Amino acid sequence: MTIGIVGRKSGMTRIFTDDGLSVPVTVVEVDPNRITQVKSVETDGYAAVQVTVGSRRASRVSKPEAGHFAKAEVEAGRTVLELRNESGEQFEVGGLLTVEAFEAGQKVDVTGASKGKGFAGVIKRYNFRMQDATHGNSLSHRAPGSIGQCQTPGRVFKGKKMAGHMGAARVTTQNLEVVRVDVERNLLLIKGAVPGAPGGDVIIRPAVKSRNNG
């Protein structure tokens, strides 16, 4: 059992089962995660493991970060992330988290930054239907329609679905299946799509919800 791991989305491909079925999979490159800090309830108020992955030029590492990595005796990585440790499993600073902790058939939750779409209208952003293309409709074909009432309440309620920035947000896709674990090449093949663009960092954790497929 593992608390999770940080990887990099490489892209999508497909593999074939023994029955000849084509299964779309996302390839996630998971280099060993180096543990830079172990947080506990007694000292930090919560239990977590701080990890880094990849590499970074020394000129791009600030002095506080350099001291932090030196204390843990690990190489500076491209990012630093935390994984909550609610299982009570024991970890040591300087240790490694690897793909060996996962197994084929396991369900996982994958968190990443979704693709940024920029400023988008309500049709693209929220799947609103378009208004009539003709029959007296002018310049309102992709408009949202009414956004509220009149003098009472005299305002637009918070959370009203309107045009705005779409994507580039933290997204989690739940209950994805690990199809294959390639320990030699540090790869995880996960069924279906995971959030984000190729090259983006993703966090892979054991699924928190169990789905009954029966």
From Swiss-Prot:
<comment type="function">
    <text>One of the primary rRNA binding proteins, it binds directly near the 3'-end of the 23S rRNA, where it nucleates assembly of the 50S subunit.</text>
</comment>
<keyword id="KW-0687">Ribonucleoprotein</keyword>
<protein>
    <recommendedName>
        <fullName>Large ribosomal subunit protein uL3</fullName>
    </recommendedName>
</protein>
<dbReference type="InterPro" id="IPR000597">
    <property type="entry name" value="Ribosomal_uL3"/>
</dbReference>
<keyword id="KW-0488">Methylation</keyword>
<dbReference type="GO" id="GO:0003735">
    <property type="term" value="F:structural constituent of ribosome"/>
</dbReference>
<keyword id="KW-0689">Ribosomal protein</keyword>
<dbReference type="GO" id="GO:0022625">
    <property type="term" value="C:cytosolic large ribosomal subunit"/>
</dbReference>
<dbReference type="InterPro" id="IPR009000">
    <property type="entry name" value="Transl_B-barrel_sf"/>
</dbReference>
<dbReference type="GO" id="GO:0006412">
    <property type="term" value="P:translation"/>
</dbReference>
<dbReference type="InterPro" id="IPR019926">
    <property type="entry name" value="Ribosomal_uL3_CS"/>
</dbReference>
<feature type="modified residue" description="N5-methylglutamine">
    <location>
        <position position="151"/>
    </location>
</feature>
<dbReference type="InterPro" id="IPR019927">
    <property type="entry name" value="Ribosomal_uL3_bac/org-type"/>
</dbReference>
<keyword id="KW-0699">rRNA-binding</keyword>
<comment type="subunit">
    <text>Part of the 50S ribosomal subunit. Forms a cluster with proteins L14 and L19.</text>
</comment>
<dbReference type="Pfam" id="PF00297">
    <property type="entry name" value="Ribosomal_L3"/>
</dbReference>
<comment type="similarity">
    <text>Belongs to the universal ribosomal protein uL3 family.</text>
</comment>
<keyword id="KW-0694">RNA-binding</keyword>
<dbReference type="GO" id="GO:0019843">
    <property type="term" value="F:rRNA binding"/>
</dbReference>
